[in-house]
Amino acid sequence: MTAASEHLVLVLNSGSSSIKYQLVDPETGEVSAAGLVERIGEDDSAIEHRCGARTIGHEGRIPDHRAGLERVFEMFAETGFDLAGAGLRAVGHRVVHGGEMFHEPTLVTDEVVAAIADFAELAPLHNPANVTGIENARRLLPGVPQVAVFDTAFFHGLPDAAKTYAIDAKIAAEYGIRRYGFHGISHEYVSGRVAEVLDLDPARLRQIVFHLGNGASASAVRGGSPIDTSMGLTPLEGLVMGTRGGDLDPGILGHLARAAGFDVDRIDKLLNREAGLKGMAGVNDFRELRRLIDEGDAAAKLAYDVYVHRLRRYLGAYLIALGGVDAITFTAGVGENSADVRADALAGLENFGIAVDPARNTAKDRGARVISPPAAPVTVLVVPTNEELAIARAADRLVAAG
């Protein structure tokens, strides 16, 4: 470990079936080590751990997040990083749901962990994994400050009309029912990067941001602040996702309960794990979906069409909500890598000043870039998200503030 290790932040992003991690210098953005634990709970689980020029891997079943994180710490040791003795600045944790309680980075205590666990009902795929990551990091790195950075925080100040559901007001107040929004760390980072890339004052920008990964969300941002977002009380609402279907008629749930005998747990499993692309096409990996489409699979093609249709519906809604748009940005795994999704989502919108340049859209450039024609009234961009850097900086600021 270098002498500058006291400036480094270990960032943990424990997802529903994965753990992403980076060892980051929050000042320079330099990444000393990084890796990904994939397909947790499946027979073909894998870890890729990168440290400088060296990469090591693990293949074989990883039963749960705890086992995955323990193996990650072993791989750090194998590549010469004694995290326990490194004098890290902090560990920063991405936490999906902060409810009404948390709307800024927070130093982790037992009470904070308990509160995050209580919100698991609202984010059942994510908060339990977040809690596991925090608990294991506290156990493996005692004495290192642990900071929770919440995905809901960016949307805490949504306008009342955007965050309020049209249900009984007393029930909503009693049970904390409102639109919270998610992927806020990414939406805040990317919308800020757009202003930097375009060299424009963010206060003057009207933006629509599509965060398209296994989870997917959209936001409308005016002057650096969100005015609407697609996810709601939970990460189930909005766009079509890998295993979540997004918007649906709530009457479907009552119908399934009466006609098929589905109880709450069965409905929860259906909506969180068996819907979306997986429910329609049998796969939740967009690369696999594309392969099936190329092979002529009709279900996969329909799933893709539903996915794009939902994107266009939110695009239209946010275009009106903003009163026009200056920049439309795609980010996250699908958003950054699928030229087809970007082109199809924005096809035929030239009358609105929205167009994609085919050559720019299919270029192999991995950085932030403009993909609209030079003279287009609306700038379309691809901007890689960097939630890890955003979390590292947030954790560093909190620790520095004492």
From Swiss-Prot:
Keyword Kinase attached: yes
Annotated positions binding Mg(2+): N13, E387
Enzyme class: transferase
EC code: 2.7.2.1
One protein family per Pfam: Acetate_kinase
Active site residues of this protein: D151
Residue numbers marked as site, Transition state stabilizer: H183, R244
Gene, per the UniProt record: ackA
Subunit structure as annotated in this protein's UniProt entry: Homodimer.
Pathway as given in its UniProt record: Metabolic intermediate biosynthesis; acetyl-CoA biosynthesis; acetyl-CoA from acetate: step 1/2
Cofactor list: Mg(2+); Mn(2+)
Entry's localization field: Cytoplasm
Provenance organism: Nocardia farcinica (strain IFM 10152)
Record's keyword terms, sorted: ATP-binding, Cytoplasm, Kinase, Magnesium, Metal-binding, Nucleotide-binding, Transferase
Protein name (record): Acetate kinase
GO cellular component assignments: cytoplasm
Primary location class: cytoplasm
GO molecular function, one term: acetate kinase activity
Catalytic activities: acetate + ATP = acetyl phosphate + ADP
